[in-house]
């Protein structure tokens, strides 16, 4: 033994009490002086730890357990006191700890894990980024600590649980260092997750996890509140577990608590990469160990609750990203179905739980899930088993429904519905354009998404959110109205086989009408709104905002391109197919339209008027087929229902006594007597009412067939009441070409009326039948009563709606003067309109627009200066019958 020693060696040796005892502690006064000495200069600190490293090697070799205990205490104190200079001696600390572990003594290893915990708490990113030697040494030390605990815990002995506790504590301590080096982080997350998961799985049933999950989520209900009591209990449990380890009295409950704390340390971080790696490791381990999927879902949800609330969405994004990658790589040889199913279940668990995810992009997530579902039904279904496809598709649908109804922001539900409808239309469009032969997959996809929408609305009713939300509007459905068409899946630009069969088209129409009808009664209006009994007493009461019964609500009257007009245009296309209309679909369509009458009132009626005249039976009996009879019956049923409900809703007490209404009833009875009426569309009660009227006035004294409800009848009806005069325009134009190709041109109808004896009757009705009977060319925009309103809004609606054209439009068809017409030659009035205007000494539209504005649109012919005397001489020379056909 040397007689003379350097000062730092003397100070160190003085800390060791004499004797060969196992449980030693450093002399407190000598230790204090040593710490002071080491903290004064970095050189002194380096000398101290260098000597301690050599002494530890010697003590471990000679099995001096008591001295090793003292050394570990000195090292812990140095780390605490000199943490700002930890980079000077961190590598020596790792070397000392590895020397201690070689003894494989439980008491020394328990002390070593405490020192390791102090070291991990003081490390920073500088050492991990600039000292590769330290990173390797620290990684080796951490691996040794985990292994020594795991290996000894599997051996039969009295201290298995204590050894397992050392591994679990290492996993918790190392979590503080995972954010400093990505490679290091990934390696040890993959090592720690299986150890922690196995311990939790061995000690917790799913019910236990649900209890922890509920406690973490902190659901605010009357049965549970998380407060100081729960927090205090957690701290007490932590201290008890440490005491049990020191006293060799570790229990399974201590291991469980330590594993949960380790998982919490892994996930309670602001590092997105660490959250993603931990999420992947959990799913990968659960798949490899065949853990019950339900237990695994709850386990992942529980871990997610420990993530800062603004970063929880990363877990869901990670699961979806991995699932998308697996879906894209899936082939017939390597389908990856089991792992896809597992990831899909975890995704469902996250979106359907009470775990809030602030910052989650709902639209993006729904798009991802819709992509996965489309890929499943259109591609993977070729090599997956049918039952597997159904199971996975159901999970995707449940994800969409639960995510859409877990409200995070005001417009979430409308955004979700729009995303679904956009996906439906885009898949349909791409399939038609590309000639995709997988019609069954596309059909199945459309039906599935429509069912998803129905479930979303049902969930919103049965489980309403406490968070205020916006409701889905009618306009959100505009893009999807193509599903009403009987020509859905048909590309008019190509001579190819239709995408869908008649049965598939019928099913799509039926499903769409069912979902839309449910939307009308449960989302657009609430359940407690009774449109039939909630009559509105006066026009002044319409000032209440948001009331769909309010005249011109959302410009449903003043805007010719409104949703109601679009919907009715597609209803017309519903009847345009070559096959016989399904009577059940027609009946369901009528119910939907009746609901629209109850909800929209005068707004619907005003838009429906031109369609009523257009849907009447052709006067040529040779052109009457089953579809035209159904359409005619639907038109008469709706106009009857409209008049009755208008009288009741707005308390007019006017309709039933009017000549138009009685003429309408007579016309209906005429159809019944002549077997032109289609039974089964209207209710039995309506049939009973209609059967009480007689057919009168359908033939004049010369025996000429006449239809009573004419435009003149409607004009007289409108003028007879202030409310109808203000809000019903009997001259509203029939706009069939909502977009080119939306409504097909009828054929072989050019001379339907040529044999009729009453030419004035022909002229009187032609404005409502022009598109079908004369191909709709050269008829301008309307007549004197609507020309003003159309001119004032035409340019605005052209620019606003030009992008809403049908996805299947070829753009080559000439417009008949629709609101989307871009050619200025059609934006002109008829001679008959100008004649009425000049002769009555007023501009068009005054009679039917009490809010008429005298200002005209720039460029309008109505703004030009006219010499009335010359105009009079010209107009008087024109025949009445020619007026309506001539365009200025």
Curated annotation (Swiss-Prot):
Similarity comment: family membership: Belongs to the EFR3 family.
Per UniProt, what is one Pfam family of this protein? EFR3
GO cellular component, as recorded: plasma membrane
Its name, as the record gives it, is: Protein EFR3
According to its UniProt entry, one GO biological process term is: protein localization to plasma membrane
């Amino acid at each position: 033994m040397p007689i003379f020693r350097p000062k730092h060696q003397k100070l160190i040796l003085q800390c060791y009490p004499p004797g060969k005892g196992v449980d030693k502690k450093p002399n407190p006064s000598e230790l204090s002086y040593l710490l002071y000495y080491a903290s004064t200069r970095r050189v002194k600190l380096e000398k101290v730890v260098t000597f301690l490293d050599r002494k530890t090697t010697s003590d471990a070799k000679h099995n001096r357990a008591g001295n090793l205990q003292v050394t570990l205490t000195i090292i812990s104190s140095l780390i605490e006191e000199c943490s700002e200079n930890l980079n000077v001696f961190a590598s020596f600390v790792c070397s000392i700890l590895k020397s201690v572990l070689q003894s494989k003594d439980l008491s020394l290893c328990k002390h070593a894990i405490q020192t390791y915990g102090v070291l991990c708490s003081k490390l920073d990113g500088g050492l991990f980024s600039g000292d590769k030697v330290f990173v390797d040494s620290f990684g080796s030390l951490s691996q040794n600590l985990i292994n020594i605990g795991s290996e000894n815990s599997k051996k039969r002995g009295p201290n298995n649980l204590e050894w397992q506790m050392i591994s679990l504590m290492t996993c918790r301590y190392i979590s503080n260092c995972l954010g400093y080096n990505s490679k290091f982080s990934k390696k040890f997350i993959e090592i720690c997750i299986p150890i922690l998961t196995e311990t939790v799985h061995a000690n917790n049933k799913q019910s236990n996890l649900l209890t922890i999950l509920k406690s973490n989520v902190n659901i605010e209900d009357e049965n549970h509140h998380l407060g100081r009591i729960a927090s205090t209990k957690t701290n007490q449990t932590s201290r008890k577990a440490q005491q049990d380890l020191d006293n060799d009295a570790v229990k399974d409950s201590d291991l469980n608590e330590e594993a949960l704390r380790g998982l919490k340390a892994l996930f309670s971080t602001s590092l997105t990469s660490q959250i993603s790696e931990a999420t992947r490791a959990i799913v990968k381990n659960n798949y490899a160990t065949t853990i019950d999927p339900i237990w695994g879902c709850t386990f992942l949800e529980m871990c997610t609750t420990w993530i800062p609330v603004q970063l929880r969405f990363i877990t869901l994004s990670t699961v979806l990203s991995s699932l998308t990658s697996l879906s894209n790589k899936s082939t017939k040889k390597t389908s990856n179905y089991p792992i896809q199913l597992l990831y899909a279940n975890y995704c469902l668990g996250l979106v359907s739980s009470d775990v809030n995810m602030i910052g989650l992009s709902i639209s993006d997530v729904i798009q991802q899930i819709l992509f996965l579902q489309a890929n499943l039904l259109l591609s993977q279904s070729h090599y997956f088993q049918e039952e597997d496809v159904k199971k996975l598709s159901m999970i995707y649908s449940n994800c969409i429904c639960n995510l859409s109804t877990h409200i995070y922001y005001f417009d979430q539900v409308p955004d979700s519905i729009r995303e679904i409808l956009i996906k439906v239309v885009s898949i349909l469009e791409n399939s038609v354009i590309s000639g995709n032969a997988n019609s069954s997959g596309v059909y199945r996809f459309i039906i599935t998404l429509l069912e998803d929408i129905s479930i979303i609305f049902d969930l919103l009713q049965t489980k309403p959110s406490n968070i205020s939300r916006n409701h889905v509007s009618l306009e959100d459905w505009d893009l999807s109205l193509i599903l009403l068409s009987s020509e859905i899946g048909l590309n008019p630009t190509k001579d190819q086989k239709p995408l869908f069969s008649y049965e598939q088209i019928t099913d799509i129409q039926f499903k769409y009408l069912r979902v839309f009808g449910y939307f009308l009664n449960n989302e657009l209006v609430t359940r407690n709104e009774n449109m039939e009994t909630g009559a509105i007493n006066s026009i002044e009461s319409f000032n209440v905002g948001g009331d769909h019964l309010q005249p011109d609500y959302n410009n449903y009257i003043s805007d010719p391109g409104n949703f109601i007009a679009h919907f009715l245009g597609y209803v017309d296309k519903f009847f345009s197919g070559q096959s016989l209309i399904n009577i059940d679909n027609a009946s369901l369509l009528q119910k939907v339209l009746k609901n629209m009458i109850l909800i929209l009132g005068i707004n619907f009626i005003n838009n429906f008027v031109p369609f009523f005249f257009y849907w009447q039976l052709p006067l040529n009996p040779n052109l009457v087929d089953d579809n035209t009879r159904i359409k005619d019956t639907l038109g008469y049923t709706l106009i009857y229902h409209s008049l009755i409900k208008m009288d009741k809703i707005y308390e007019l007490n006017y309709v039933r006594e009017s000549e138009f209404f009685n003429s309408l009833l007579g016309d209906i009875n005429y159809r019944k007597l002549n077997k032109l009426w289609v039974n089964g569309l209207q209710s039995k009660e309506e049939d009973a009412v209609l059967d009480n009227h007689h057919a009168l006035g359908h033939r004049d004294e010369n025996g000429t067939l006449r239809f009573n409800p004419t435009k003149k009848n409607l004009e007289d009806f409108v003028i007879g009441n202030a409310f109808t005069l203000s809000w019903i325009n009997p001259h509203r134009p029939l706009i069939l070409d909502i977009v080119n190709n939306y409504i097909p041109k009828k054929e072989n109808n050019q001379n339907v009326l040529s044999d009729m004896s009453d030419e004035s009757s022909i002229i009187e009705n032609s404005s409502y039948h022009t598109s079908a009977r004369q191909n709709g060319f050269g008829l301008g925009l309307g007549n004197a009563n609507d020309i003003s309103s159309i001119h004032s809004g035409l340019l605005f609606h052209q620019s606003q709606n030009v992008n809403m054209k049908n996805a299947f439009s070829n753009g080559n068809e000439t417009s008949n003067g629709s609101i989307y017409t871009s050619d200025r030659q059609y934006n002109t009035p008829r001679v008959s309109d100008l004649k009425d205007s000049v002769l009555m000494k007023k501009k068009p539209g005054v009679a039917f627009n009490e809010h008429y504005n005298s200002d005209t649109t720039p460029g309008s012919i109505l703004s030009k200066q006219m010499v009335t005397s010359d105009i009079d001489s010209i107009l008087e020379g024109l025949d009445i019958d020619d007026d309506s056909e001539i365009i200025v």
